[in-house]
Amino acid sequence: MDEWYGQVAPREKLLKYGAAVLTDAELLAIFLRTGIPGMHVMKMAEYLIETFGSLHGLISADYQTLCAHKGIGASKYSQIQAIGELACRCFSSHLMRESVLLNPGITQKFLQNILSHREREIFLVVFLDNQHRVIRHEEMFTGTISSVEVHPREIVREALKVNAAALILAHNHPSGKAEPSQADRLITTQVIKACSLLDIRVLDHLVVGRGECVSFAERGWL
């Protein structure tokens, strides 16, 4: 991957100017390292991102879907999955060190990274200590493509187990639209009531769509 199209190769460009100036395709090409006969690694990276619509779409693709494309086997699938997992862990480690109230943007990005590509509704809870630092996060309930059944008592039980003082609720809408439903508002109220009996605060409920996130707290619904 020394030169491509007569321009500076992605690796050399990164070393000279920093990773931030590289395109998604250039960053992907560095991970993939090699192309296939008749297709340079940059061409492969561009093709994959164009085919799946975005880097996020590519990383979210399952094994069978991705490996249906020429030149993609277990090795390159593993490399692509590693990109997504590294990004997730990077956000997670940053979130674990931060106060959620001081940096809500990181919290939203972290939850979007986990939930926005999921094909079923997932209800996730972030458990916080009394200084609103993250203790852990847990995907507590898994539903269908259009709904998820949530049990407030199980959330309270888990909060007591980890000695949480506060919670952030989050779930995704696989449809891609993040606008909360009446059912979303109802279950939020039920969780708040269950938690309030034990002085556990619900700081927010985030609904994650495709490329967007709606905060109950920002809308004044809590």
UniProtKB/Swiss-Prot annotation:
Q: Which PROSITE patterns match?
A: MPN, UPF0758
The record lists Zn(2+) as bound by H171, H173, D184
Note the superkingdom of the native organism. Answer: Bacteria
Q: Where is the MPN domain?
A: 100-222
Keyword entries, A-Z? Hydrolase, Metal-binding, Metalloprotease, Protease, Zinc
Q: A Gene Ontology biological process annotation?
A: proteolysis
Q: Tell me the Gene3D superfamilies matching this sequence.
A: Cytidine Deaminase, domain 2
A single Gene Ontology MF term assigned here is:
metal ion binding
Q: Where is this motif: JAMM motif?
A: 171-184
Instruction: Show the HAMAP family listed in the entry.
Output: UPF0758_YicR
Q: Which family does it belong to?
A: Belongs to the UPF0758 family. YicR subfamily.
Q: Which NCBIfam families match?
A: PRK00024.1, radc
Q: What is this protein called?
A: UPF0758 protein YPO0049/y0092/YP_0050
Source species of the chain: Yersinia pestis
> Upper lineage ranks?
Bacteria, Pseudomonadati, Pseudomonadota, Gammaproteobacteria, Enterobacterales
